[in-house]
Design a protein with these regions (language model features):
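Conserved, well-ordered alpha-helix/loop/beta-strand core segments that scaffold catalytic motifs
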Residues: 1-25, 32
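Beta-lactam-recognizing serine transpeptidase/beta-lactamase-like catalytic domain environment
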Residues: 7, 31-83, 88-248
Length: 248
């Protein structure tokens, strides 16, 4: 059987060029169908080496490589979602209606919580007064810290993250995929025997801390936004053709 993939050769090459030789991953989805039209993980390897006489030696070399070329980072490497998570936070703020989206919060560039000082990425004097629209556009940390700790809380934040597919398999047609982590107070207690702290909520509000996702999770989240919440299962297989038949 011949397997026809959803990969678009032109976009695949563009993604490879954009990533270059930096260790990481790039993935492009077609929001209207879930088709994966580009998937890059670097470093990578030539699978043809396994058809040679010294395939066992080649495998051992790849397996021991500290840069892990056999790891498909698109679906099996975990990273903090960082500021992409503010998309989920914005959805939660609009849906829960606990804080008017046009009401402004001042960003002085930093905020004190307990005995810790959390600094916005722009530093002092900060972004000034921002509503939700501008806070998202400028990726203001202070705005989302305040909304996360004072209005949403860890349970709501985690629930919305799960609604966007975080913390679960996206069931792509590959042998395995890492689910990632969407932390809750219960999760932290089970894993570390530690209580959930306000600082933990600060961290997850901007996609940091214990939250971990794959690049595919983030691409899928943005596809859901494009589709107004509708989700399609990400997939690589377009069709299966029988080489003995005339497939046009």
């Amino acid at each position: 059987k011949n397997l026809i993939l959803t990969i678009d050769n032109r976009i695949q090459r563009l993604a490879e060029k954009a990533l270059g030789e930096r260790i990481g991953a790039a993935v492009v989805l077609k929001p209207a169908s879930g088709e994966v039209i580009a998937m890059v993980s670097y470093p990578y390897f030539d699978a043809n080496v396994f058809s040679t006489d010294d395939s066992s030696v080649q495998y051992a070399m790849l397996a021991s490589d500290k840069n892990k070329p056999m790891l498909n980072r698109v679906v099996n490497a975990e990273y903090p979602p960082a500021s992409t998570f503010k998309t989920i936070m914005s959805t939660a703020i609009l849906s829960e209606k606990l804080f008017p989206s046009d009401k402004k919060i001042e960003c002085p560039g930093r905020i004190t919580y307990g005995d810790r000082v959390f600094r916005c990425h722009v530093g002092v004097p900060g972004h000034g007064w921002l509503d939700l629209k501008n806070a998202l556009a400028q990726s203001c940390d202070v705005y989302f810290w305040v909304l996360g700790t004072d209005y949403l809380g860890v349970d709501r934040i985690s629930s919305y993250a799960q609604e966007f597919g975080f913390g679960q398999s996206l069931e792509i047609d590959l042998p395995a995929q890492t689910k990632g982590t969407v932390p809750t107070a219960q999760w932290k207690w089970r894993k570390y025997r530690e209580k959930w702290l306000g600082g933990d909520t600060m961290n997850i509000s901007i996609g940091q801390g214990y939250t971990l996702v794959t690049p595919l999770h983030v691409a899928n989240m943005m596809a859901m936004v494009c589709n107004s919440g509708k989700i399609y299962r990400p997939h690589l297989l377009k069709e299966v053709r029988d080489p003995s038949k005339n497939n046009e």
